[in-house]
């Protein structure tokens, strides 16, 4: 008999068929076990779980006594209680490599659209405000040759540094737990303290995940150390930045502008002051949202689950100490 799994996000038909070759697939639209008796029953038998979103904590795991592996269609896993999973011997799989280039593209798009005021000015043209040759009140600022400061030199940070260095001749500064030799050799990047990064960067680009250590890492004190001409770009996790202090800094001119793909609360509330500011480009967490990359993420997650439940995992495991070997 095939192992039973719960699939709680729609995936392409060919990937669903790939899962079905190995497992009995129970498909659901999201994880709401309180309202879905069928889901509760499926979780009781499930050895595998695959999807994205939802809160996978100790209480949820009690509903799935036979679970051996969970595969998230994302690189982030802050909605999973990793400690609880590990205590149960459940492998947690994610997709850290397939979205790198696309997220770096998104960050460059945010840099360009924010610096050149693309969204704001496009809306003004649509509103019929372009009646004559534009004056300096419609001007933006250059991106090329400006200093980029990357907070978090991981895979996405490296891909962003490559674009900035080779595409826009930007000096690269970065802050991370340790120096990154490849970044320094390939892009002439300079490892520096957070204070130096804040003081010297024209674009502060945040790629950090959400952890206890990174929560509100950028707050009032840090924003005050930035150039008044600086632009903040966040495509890491919303809570890395104290959103209320960011709003104040954008309103009073402490910093020039912000391009944001992530927020403390998602979806962003319709009454958020961020939506009233002309110096903000806000997009709905589109970092990896292309047809190609989302397909590749789903395919990676499918392969991850197959590998985890067949004992053939070689990569992409968040808690490798519990890897299934049988």
Curated annotation (Swiss-Prot):
Main location as per UniProt: cytoplasm
UniProt entry keywords in alphabetical sequence: Cytoplasm, NAD, NADP, Oxidoreductase
InterPro entries given in the database record: D-isomer_2-hydroxyacid_DH, D-isomer_2_OHA_DH_cat_dom, D-isomer_DH_CS, D-isomer_DH_CS1, D-isomer_DH_NAD-bd, Glyo/OHPyrv_Rdtase_B, NAD(P)-bd_dom_sf
Active site residues per record: 237, 266, 285 (proton donor)
EC number(s) stated in the UniProt entry for this protein: 1.1.1.79, 1.1.1.81
Matches recorded under Gene3D superfamilies: NAD(P)-binding Rossmann-like Domain
Reaction equations catalysed: glycolate + NADP(+) = glyoxylate + NADPH + H(+); (R)-glycerate + NAD(+) = 3-hydroxypyruvate + NADH + H(+); (R)-glycerate + NADP(+) = 3-hydroxypyruvate + NADPH + H(+)
Listed GO CC annotations: cytosol; plasma membrane
Keyword Membrane: no
Subcellular location as annotated: Cytoplasm
One MF term in the entry's GO annotations: hydroxypyruvate reductase (NADPH) activity
Record's keyword annotation contains NADP: yes
HAMAP family xrefs: 2_Hacid_dh_C_GhrB
Similarity-based family: Belongs to the D-isomer specific 2-hydroxyacid dehydrogenase family. GhrB subfamily.
Physiological role: Catalyzes the NADPH-dependent reduction of glyoxylate and hydroxypyruvate into glycolate and glycerate, respectively.
Subunit structure: Homodimer.
Protein name: Glyoxylate/hydroxypyruvate reductase B
Organism: Yersinia pestis bv. Antiqua (strain Nepal516)
